[in-house]
Amino acid sequence: MAARQKAQEVGVVPIGNGGGAALHFLASVLQARNIVEVGTGTGVSGLWLLRGMTEGGVLTSVDLEAEHQRLAREAFSEAGFAPQRFRLIAGSALDVLPRLTDAGYDLVFLDGDKVEYSEYFDEAIRLVRPGGVIVFDNALWHDRVADPAQRDPETSAIRDALKKVGDDDRLRSVLLPVGDGLLAAQLIG
């Protein structure tokens, strides 16, 4: 996959095949028409999501790095996806997400700055429709999340976000032990 090779060239860690297959499955089961992704990378996870979405579905992907988005645009086009199937927004997720439509998305995939996971969740819960799913990548964070002795900013932030999800009565969630861990949480309703 060209997008995976490009990721290695620019120093981006793409989602693994197991995590990608899980994203494809979720997008397909949800018959997703609208998905938000935080952390475009070079398009690896976006390709999995696009392939699982309904025909004509639109992926909105947010990333700070315009170069990463250029590479993702190339990957999506090379894979045969028409430009109207994806919307790439360069900018901080915390600036972009508040401008997106409430309850307008079937799936929200979070794979951006780990320190901002809790804030991403606050936006995602507003963006996802009832019955939709919020997915956090790196929920195990190299097996550091379960170790209380690990207190670095990323690990602590992921741990806090996962606790927020677990404490929220509006959600039913599951931790999928694929790749570096995917936490999937469905908005009940």
Regions picked out by a protein language model, each given a short descriptive name:
Residues 1-107, 114-135, 139-189:
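A short alpha-helical cap/connector motif
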